[in-house]
Amino acid sequence: MPEDRKPPAQIRQFDHREFGVPRLLEHKESTLVSVCLPARNEGLTVGPIVATLRTELLLTGVVDEILVIDDHSTDNTAAVAREAGARVVSAADILPEYGGGFGKGEVLWKSLYVAEGDVIVWCDADISQFGSRFVSGILGPLLCESDVDLAKGFYRRPERDREGGGRVTELVARPLLSLFCPELAELHQPLSGEYGGKRAVLEQL
């Protein structure tokens, strides 16, 4: 191995079935957990997602906050999310002194400013077959494994999307990571919208 080649990153793999509610609560203790949903014109899907998170994770005590960051939606995203039980914040109202940009990247860094959690999990707001496992599978390693600071989800796509999904990941993202950051080559879906981390680490990135 060339001397300038970085050592492999410590990437570990977990399964959401390892992290049921009892185990998550056992390790959570006083840790505050926020789930953040960046959303733009997701009025059709954000409601069921928030409702599921509220019933299965918020009311059970695993999650302390469900936060929807509304990115200049022109539909009823904000109203639907609020009615389902989320705290809704407009991206335009967060740190306006730094400019009012658009897009997911803008929402992600701003959400770190308004989220209350010590651990923050982000999840896409357009998932049509959502289950709380999308969040608990990411949250589990962050709560139960002391040496895990960042977690990123991957999953099998629905059969109907097999031919049309994941092309950017397989043809662009993963080859580029393998070329320029080979220590991250093991990431299955580097562009997936489900990931999380500990605030102490995220604020340094």
Stretches with model-predicted labels:
Residues D64, A78-W109, V114:
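Conserved donor nucleotide-binding strand/loop of the catalytic core
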